[in-house]
Amino acid sequence: MKKNLSILLLAFLLACTSNELILKVVSAGQLFDDIQKNNSSDLILINVWSTWCVPCIEEFPYIVDLESKYKPKDLDVIFVSTDWDENSVEVQDFLLKENVFGRHYRKEEGNDQEFINELCSSWSGVLPFTVVYDRNMALIDFWGGKKDEHFFKSKIDSLINSKGQEI
């Protein structure tokens, strides 16, 4: 009986951990540091979005879907909200509604241009914005504006295949 209870408790704790959302407020430098500490994937896709951005919300499900289509060793999907502090509850509610769990971020208020330049110096500031890095945080690719499901799948397939040829 005691053994069964221990197994049940362990299963419950593991289930809770996998469905946990962690939303940290960060600068670009803190974002990179945190990703490097917590990531083991070959590719890191960072999507910058906001709850008030209609194109961001429209493409969001396509990006969420990527995590179920690829192995964790191949791709890590990270969302960074640009919403202000006063909208932090809306950000968290939206992520949970979209079944987004794990470690994600909200850009700290202020220093927008500094954040843009650190994330990708070629970024105009348009939302949504998606950038892909390798495991060492070397820039691989980026694009701005809303993209469709086919674009995301084709792009990630291509990047994973090209990474496989380098190894």
Task: Label every PLM stretch briefly.
Residues 23-44:
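A short beta-strand-turn-helix
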Residues 48-62:
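Conserved redox-active cysteine motifs that mediate thiol-disulfide chemistry
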Residues 94-127:
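Short, internal strand/loop/helix patches
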Residues 127-167:
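Thiol-/selenol-based redox modules, centered on thioredoxin-like
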Residues 42-44, 48-52, 84, 126:
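Short pre-active-site segment immediately N-terminal to redox-active cysteine/selenocysteine motifs
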Residues 60-81, 96:
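Conserved helix-turn-beta segment immediately C-terminal to the redox Cys motif
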Residues 10-18:
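Hydrophobic h-region of N-terminal signal peptides that target proteins for export
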Residues 74-88, 100-110:
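Thiol-based oxidoreductase modules, predominantly thioredoxin-like and allied folds used
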